[in-house]
């Protein structure tokens, strides 16, 4: 979820999010949920040798995330979809090389099922439901000018 912080400046300054691949869903996980699962796994019996695949409780597209952002901030934030060429140019400007760009494109144009499949792992390991993107946004609204 913290990847959404990349939008903070444009949301504060212009009230917009510029992002590519508007139909690509992801089941982002809250960093606190990662920490909670790790804490249980490290301090409780029965976790030796276990692998845990973690997701958030919902798979959202970028426009859906922006709608949540607007709701939490109490103001309209506009979603502007970038073309594939525009997003690739942006990644290159940020210093990403060919291998990284190819990986990013694959993850967005043909993501693995694990990237958008909601799993119950956080609840199963911690006994608490995974935090939603709306909860994360509420905790981080100040970064977006809220």
Per-region residue spans from a language model:
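A hydrophobic C-terminal alpha-helical subdomain
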Residues: 85-146
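Oxidoreductase cofactor-interface core, primarily capturing Rossmann-like NAD(P)-dependent enzymes
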Residues: 1-78, 82, 89-94, 99-100, ...
């Amino acid at each position: 979820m913290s990847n959404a912080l990349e939008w903070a400046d444009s949301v504060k300054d212009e009230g917009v999010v510029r992002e590519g691949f508007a139909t690509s869903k992801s089941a982002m996980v809250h960093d606190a949920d990662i920490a909670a699962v790790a804490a249980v796994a490290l301090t409780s019996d029965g976790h030796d040798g276990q692998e845990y695949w973690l997701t958030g409780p919902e798979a959202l597209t970028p426009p859906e995330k922006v709608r949540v952002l607007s709701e939490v901030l109490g103001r309209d934030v506009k979603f502007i979809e970038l073309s594939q060429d525009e997003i690739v140019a942006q990644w290159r400007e940020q210093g990403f090389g060919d291998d990284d760009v190819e990986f990013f494109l694959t993850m967005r144009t043909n993501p693995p099922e694990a990237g958008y499949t909601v799993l119950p792992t956080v609840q199963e390991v911690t006994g608490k439901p995974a935090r939603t993107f709306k909860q994360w946004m509420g905790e981080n609204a100040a970064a977006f000018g809220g």
